[in-house]
Amino acid sequence: MAEQKAKVVHGPGPRGMGGPRPKVENSGRLLKRIMAEVFQHYLPHCILVLICIVVSALANVQASLFLQTLIDDYIIPMTQQQDPSFAPLAGALMRVGCIYVVGILAAWLNARIMVNVTQGTLRNLRVQLFTHMESLPIRYFDTHPHGDIMSVYTNDVDTLRQMLSQSIPQLVSSAITIVSVFASMCMLSWQLTIVTMLMVALMMFCSKKITQQSGKFFIAQQRDLGKVNGYIEEMMEGQKVVKVFTHEQKTLEGFRELNDKLKDSAKQANSFANIIMPVTAQLGNISYAICALAGAAMAVSGVGSVTLGTVMAFLALNKSFNMPISQVSMQANSIIMALAGAERIFKMMDEPSEADEGYVTLVNAKYDKDDTLVETSERTGIWAWKHPHHDGTTTYHKLEGDITFTDVDFGYLPDKTVLHDINLYGRPGQKIAFVGSTGAGKTTITNLINRFYDIQDGKIRYDGINIQKIRKSDLRRSLGIVLQDTHLFTGTVMENIRYGRLDASDEECIAAARLANADGFIKRLPDGYNTMLTGDGANLSQGQRQLLAIARAAVADPPVLILDEATSSIDTRTEALVQRGMDGLMYGRTSFVIAHRLSTVRNADCIVVLEQGRIIERGNHDELIAKKGKYYQLYTGNLAEN
């Protein structure tokens, strides 16, 4: 674990991912950005969906208008005939039936296309999120709970699914329906239209008030859901610690507290959301009843040439008009919840990527006939720094593994320095060991070598090149790292070793395992190198996981090694086994080693003793023992413990 990391300061959102709530003025910006994602890849599909929506809406309106013709031109005249002919009525019904079929087909096609558009858009968003996540600096992951980041991929992205597949198409359909129905109602009776619009205004007023209340609770619901996911992820990772200290009840209480908050916010959000439809439906029924009474009175008195057919057609249109108003109110809550999720999605996507202004790259090299270093596409075992110059020329400098710190200061926070005036060097092939108490700055130094963090002052040079001029991906490719917390991936043992170099052959992976002395236990596994590992290698012991991590570093064959307490979790017998392999791995390579067991660094060329971010001693083992300073105290204390 890196010492003295920046204090995590969480915002009002879900443990650091939240931030300010989506404001009303941001809703348009968020919606525009979401739709831009859709149109970028699915504009033709969206145009076809719009056509289907228009056809479906017009079919419904035409079917409602047919009621006037049906009653005034067919049913009433037929009631006045002694021997009516049903053939004209049957023909009319066939025509309206065709209209209904066209509307149904358009609605079906619309739904099918929107499923494709929605799932494709969500897939693209997840890919963009993952791609951007990989470009984020380590600092981001150190200050944001992993469970909350996962919540962005799952819950927040899923809120967009309902909005894209249902809410947006429904809103467009409702808008087209409202316009077409309104025009049709005006043609039938402007007086009844005024009555309808007065009730619609009341419906919209009530919906707006309810939506304003439910919106803030939907945002809180997404925030609380992120907290619950973050807590679950944290407890799953720390389940062994929970059981060791028998804190099951305590963690359950913590979960219940977060879960109750989620329940409360979800209950409040859905309580308001669920009353929108009943309220608007009842207001719609009132509007229907008023129009029926007014229409009947007008038909009886002959006002405005209103007929019985006109009243029936208008009442059908009234239903068609009120329904989209109610649907708009319902979909508004879905959109608000989706925008709350979108705020978190785009907040993560807008996080600045890891800055990298490096231009020096790492390439395979060989010596030509003139003994000049040149670039090659073949893997020769020789690496070179490719250094382009302003005049267009390029020079190649053989990678030696010479790393130098000069007057380096660093702090995780700008106003708090944790490393002070660090001066050290690692010559090619040397083994440099860092020792010191917890929080002294050992791991922080190794984080600076691979540029997980950048220094505030001073210089770090790699083969004489300022590492800020080296492209980060190439810098890290030249480093083999065994982290304190071993992480393995789901897959076979062979695949986990090959992760160090993806183009490594099976033979090279096996050779690396032998070098790390991991070959013996691997062969005893049920399927040997093809044994599947699950759950971060949970079916292996801690020592076995660390041996695989060492083999993974070995197959990369890097010129520089960083071993962050690589053997601190291995038992003494396994440590002796590993040490022989590690000595062979480190031979000829610059190696930076951190270990709590000082016996593992006794043969280091240089031992650097750190205390509170400063180098207080340096030298080899014998020199530091003779000084009887801090190293002597640590070493003798270590021996006493053994």
Question: PLM ranges: what are they?
Answer:
Residues 20-28, 52, 59-75, 90, ...:
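Juxtamembrane helix-loop junctions of ABC transporter transmembrane domains
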Residues 1-60, 75-96, 110-114, 118, ...:
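Membrane-integrated ABC transporters
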Residues 82, 365-642:
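ABC-type nucleotide-binding domain
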Residues 13-23, 119, 127-151, 155-157, ...:
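Short intracellular "coupling" helices and adjacent cytoplasmic loop segments at the cytosolic face
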Residues 41, 45-58, 166-220, 293-306:
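Transmembrane helices of ABC transporter permease
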Residues 77, 184-198, 268, 272-343, ...:
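Helix-loop-helix
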Residues 32, 51, 106, 110, ...:
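Hydrophobic alpha-helical transmembrane segments of ABC transporter permease domains
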Residues 40-43, 138-139, 155-164, 168, ...:
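An intracellular "coupling" helix at the cytosolic face of ABC transporter transmembrane type-1 domains
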